Amino acid sequence: MTNIRKSHPLTKIINNSFIDLPTPSNISAWWNFGSLLGICLILQILTGLFLAMHYTSDTTTAFSSVTHICRDVNYGWIIRYMHANGASMFFICLFLHVGRGLYYGSYMFPETWNIGIILLFTVMATAFMGYVLPWGQMSFWGATVITNLLSAIPYIGTNLVEWIWGGFSVDKATLTRFFAFHFILPFIISALAAVHLLFLHETGSNNPSGIPSNSDKIPFHPYYTIKDILGALLLTLTLMILVLFSPDLLGDPDNYTPANPLNTPPHIKPEWYFLFAYAILRSIPNKLGGVLALISSILILAIIPLLHTSKQRSMMFRPLSQCLFWLLVADLLTLTWIGGQPVEYPYIAIGQLASILYFTILLILMPMTSIIENNLLKW
């Protein structure tokens, strides 16, 4: 009798995806982040579900319902902080996952890469709307500032913003719809993640060398299941240290003040994981220009496969490209720092230089360096 694991329609899918999947024998710890993102997503859906049982999406009670969760609900505080800091872990894993893709040339699988970009946008939208829900000062003003950016769109901008708000300002209608979207989007993300995996399994995984590994594959289980479990344990450890020792480390103190439309906080800034994009937005004095630069900073990932001029897929054996890659990482860290600083000298100038450098590295320096490396190979 055939093993039910390989014959039953449901278990066959699981078997071919997570058990008997032929996997390159040399993939490193950088390949762990896909599974870690899956774990983060499950954690966020579960903690979010329990939070939604006690949360009320009304402007008069939203802030106090979050306080109620932390004070009165059994273990409500840990659920709330696991959800808030789980989002930070999610983005850390996301950035490392995308960075891995850039470094090792995983973008040469166009379908997988493009679905990944859509996933990135969807997760960013979900996180933004989630940040609005506690209805603190930074929630309210963050929502006001970011949604207002759409008014930069010619002709329809103002109408579009008021349509999203459901009125003439961020109010009850806005909060209710943001809660509805924040609830539904993670399930859309789950579906997209399944499609992401589907396309990945059409081609098989890339590996650090960037060389086809069809001649040297090993089963996913037990080799990579045990490796993923180790990654999951380290992720859980990091998250729980954050939650139990310094849960507010990555949050904003202003969000412990209830939303007040009559009082603007001195420095409006988003959560840390959006600061790099926020710095790029602020570095351009023109509103529409800033919005276009903001969108381009993420959408630029979509044209990375077109800019690949190297004869090698991975950066493993390309030292000049490696230097540029780490310069890009340093530049993004600089942008993250600048995004959290007030709009004054010298931060404005540093932000503008870092923004120019970001686009220059990706659009000009990396393709040119690859051509130089190709010529060096001829020597």
Curated annotation (Swiss-Prot):
Q: Which residues bind a ubiquinone?
A: H201
Co-factor binding details: Binds 2 heme b groups non-covalently.
Binding of heme b b562, residues: H83, H182
Alphabetized InterPro entries for the sequence: Cyt_b/b6_C, Cyt_b/b6_C_sf, Cyt_b/b6_N, Cytb/b6-like_sf, Cytochrome_b, Cytochrome_b_C_euk/bac, Cytochrome_b_N_euk/bac, Di-haem_cyt_TM
Localization per Swiss-Prot or TrEMBL: Mitochondrion inner membrane
The cross-references to CDD domains, in alphabetical order and at most eight, read: cytochrome_b_C (cd00290), Cytochrome_b_N (cd00284)
What Gene Ontology biological process does one annotation of this record name?
mitochondrial electron transport, ubiquinol to cytochrome c
The main location class comes to mitochondrion
Q: Which terms does the record give in the GO molecular function aspect?
A: metal ion binding; ubiquinol-cytochrome-c reductase activity
Sorted alphabetically, the keyword list is:
Electron transport, Heme, Iron, Membrane, Metal-binding, Mitochondrion, Mitochondrion inner membrane, Respiratory chain, Transmembrane, Transmembrane helix, Transport, Ubiquinone
Please tell me whether the keyword Protein biosynthesis is annotated for this protein. Answer: no
Q: Which PROSITE patterns match?
A: CYTB_CTER, CYTB_NTER
Task: One GO cellular component term, please give it.
Answer: respiratory chain complex III
Give the top-rank taxon of the lineage listed in the UniProt record for this protein: Eukaryota
Cofactor(s) demanded: heme b
Q: Which residues bind heme b b566?
A: H97, H196
The protein's role, per its UniProt record:
Component of the ubiquinol-cytochrome c reductase complex (complex III or cytochrome b-c1 complex) that is part of the mitochondrial respiratory chain. The b-c1 complex mediates electron transfer from ubiquinol to cytochrome c. Contributes to the generation of a proton gradient across the mitochondrial membrane that is then used for ATP synthesis.
Query: PANTHER family from the xrefs?
Result: CYTOCHROME B
* Miscellaneous notes: Heme 1 (or BL or b562) is low-potential and absorbs at about 562 nm, and heme 2 (or BH or b566) is high-potential and absorbs at about 566 nm.
Assembly with partners or alone: The cytochrome bc1 complex contains 11 subunits: 3 respiratory subunits (MT-CYB, CYC1 and UQCRFS1), 2 core proteins (UQCRC1 and UQCRC2) and 6 low-molecular weight proteins (UQCRH/QCR6, UQCRB/QCR7, UQCRQ/QCR8, UQCR10/QCR9, UQCR11/QCR10 and a cleavage product of UQCRFS1). This cytochrome bc1 complex then forms a dimer.
Question: Which family does the record assign?
Answer: Belongs to the cytochrome b family.
Query: How is this protein named in the record?
Result: Cytochrome b
Origin species: Arctonyx collaris (Hog badger)
